[in-house]
Amino acid sequence: SGGAGGNALMFGIGGNGGAGGAASGVGNGGVGGAGGAGGALVAIGGAGGAGGAATTGTGGAGGAGSNALGLFLGLGGSGGQGGDSAMGSGGAGGAGGSGGAASPFGIDIGIGGAGGHGGAGTNGGAGGAGGAGGSSGTVFALDLSWGGAGGNGGAATTGTGGAGGTGGFAVAPDFIGFGAAYGGAGGLGGAATGAGGTGGTGGVGAGGFAALGVGVGGAGGAGGAATETGGIGGAGGLGVGLLGGAGGAGGPGGAASAGSGGHGGTGGDALGLIGAGIGGVGGVGGAATDTGGNGGAGGSGTGLLGGVGGAGGHGGGASVGTGGSGGAGGDGFGFVGAGGNGGNAGTGVGVNGANGGNGGSATGALAAVGGAGAAGGDATSGTGGFGGAGGSARGLIFALGGAGAAGGDASTGVG
């Protein structure tokens, strides 16, 4: 195993962890060392070492990035990459270190380190999780934080691609000033000849609990591409903020060259405590030869001022089969509420058409508008896809339900 990196003082960068040793025989690769801690005022954590390669065993896991806490700036170290394996499974990527700042009156910036990528092998290694970013909560100041991105899953030769790592959590709890927090993006799923890896979930963003602040959830990672079955897209992260919140977008499903596309990830929910909440859009389904992946559902939006649901993801197209169905729009809740529109059905030339997504419902203390449904896909000799239903609307003064969509045509079958 690799040794740990050294620590740094004051304005400093921690040393990187050493790489794990390679194994030429039956054994597994060595584990990468952890990174060293950064300085007290400005802290940059050291990166984790890479895992060692293996021949018939499992690649070594990547070392973890170091946590970094500085007075004004903290940047977590990135996780080490997992080791590859020629005839075994790839090693897992190391987790990114957290980054934080603790200045009582200045500008606090905390950035989480990225997770390490998984190693390649017969089955791909999982990507490491991104590190958290945050601050201690300053007064009369500005808090900015970013969660680290999740590492990508490793590629697979004969099996399943590695799952993408989860994006890091971000928090900016400014008391009187302004805080903004952005969750880290999920890692990509690993590519494979069999089944592609699942994309990582986006990180949560939470900002300004007691002051003006916004929180934005991280986007979900894309599913891995594959020959047989594309990977599922990762879900978008939750966004929470006193002033406003926005959910992260769902990751797209992985494409498949000869099988079924992966489904799109669900959009992240959003909460604006006194402002607006906007749900994340659903991920697009993966394209394929036989069957397209379904689109992901849009996230819900909730806010005292207004809530807007995210749009559903479109279904993936299919070159010789049936396209994927569209995802449903997210619901909206608030003083004014609006439901998200449903996603379109994927194009295809199969016997039956894919269904269009339903519109999201809306609830508003003053007014509400339901989301529109999406049109159903056309068919050849079977049944056309159902048109999506319009979303319901409930408002004290004004309410408008969403429009329903047209059903799909059929050339020699039933519309």
Whereabouts are the PLM-identified features?
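Glycine-centric low-complexity repeats
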Residues: S1-G415
